[in-house]
Amino acid sequence: MTGRIAGAWAAFVLAAGSMAAAQTYTIIDIGVLKGDNESSGFAINNLGEVVGCSDTKNVQGYPCTGLVPGQHGFSWTQSGGMKDLGTLSGATVSGAIGVNDSGTVVGYSNMKGQIATNFNAVQWSSTGAITNLGTLSGGSSSAAFEINSAGEVTGDSFLSSGIVNATSWTSKKIKNLGALSKAIFTAGLAINDSGQIVGESVFGYGPPFTSHGFLWNGSTMKDLGTLTGGITSVANAINTSGVIVGQSDGSNTRGSWHAVLWNSSDKIQDLGTIPGGTYSIAFGVNDSSVVVGYGNLSNNAAHATVWTSTGGMQDLNSLIPSNSGWVLINANAVNNAGQITGYGTKGGSNHAFLLTPVN
């Protein structure tokens, strides 16, 4: 369910129903690890377990990415609270990016003696034990972004040539999934329980950077293309039915990204923006095709969004209690119960949140 880190790793339709009929949410502050003041929620499983990043470096005002020394991956449950997942032995930074329903978490960590730009894909067991998933042969760095129910993992790895290719890991082996033609950076950002993988291939060193979203179906990589007239797209998440979400530019997007959805036949749909906004991005989708992400308002402020086929694109801030004290900035993932995680500001700091639908 995630591409939200890929941008950092590599360098949201008018509401159709009345507000009375719109889905509303309760909100929980997931908090931070002891001594921290910033956190982000990156993924959520169907049991409501959230994983993400907490900032032990106190780089206040910036969303935690798990790419800065002192930042640590975490897992959180409502009953157990937040747990520091730590790093590989002697390392200084980690990010927890994906989690399956068994509580197995994937992400990345640097290694002892490595600079904080060299990472290895890692996996944490449900008990917190960390495993280095390694890199493709000759590669210096790798990252894991999602794990499915079978324990299949997707992400990326450097090759000895310096090119980055989409990668998968199973209990038996690491596999090079390749790249779209002429790409220099390719990452697998999400995987469903059928083993379908989506992500992006980036072409050239830019600027401008151009990329295309892709779908890997087990043997071949398909270019998902862009909105009409576009040059750039990213596929960030895929659900059980093969519905894919991400972002694309196009001739009608005024030079900005719009959140998009590819249906199970890979036909692309522009999901639009918050009314008055100019851009949007979709980061997560559940099996009911509820889509979450973020977009801008007319004043260019970034707000977390939710999109449904009946309600269109909505600002999540309009769907939580008005006296909550929160400004929700980004929604990264949504589970099949409709619970959403991401990050927002409360009391001047970025904190991870959990939204739960009010039935």
Region roles according to the model:
Residues 2-359:
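Residue-level hotspots at or immediately adjacent to binding/recognition sites across diverse folds
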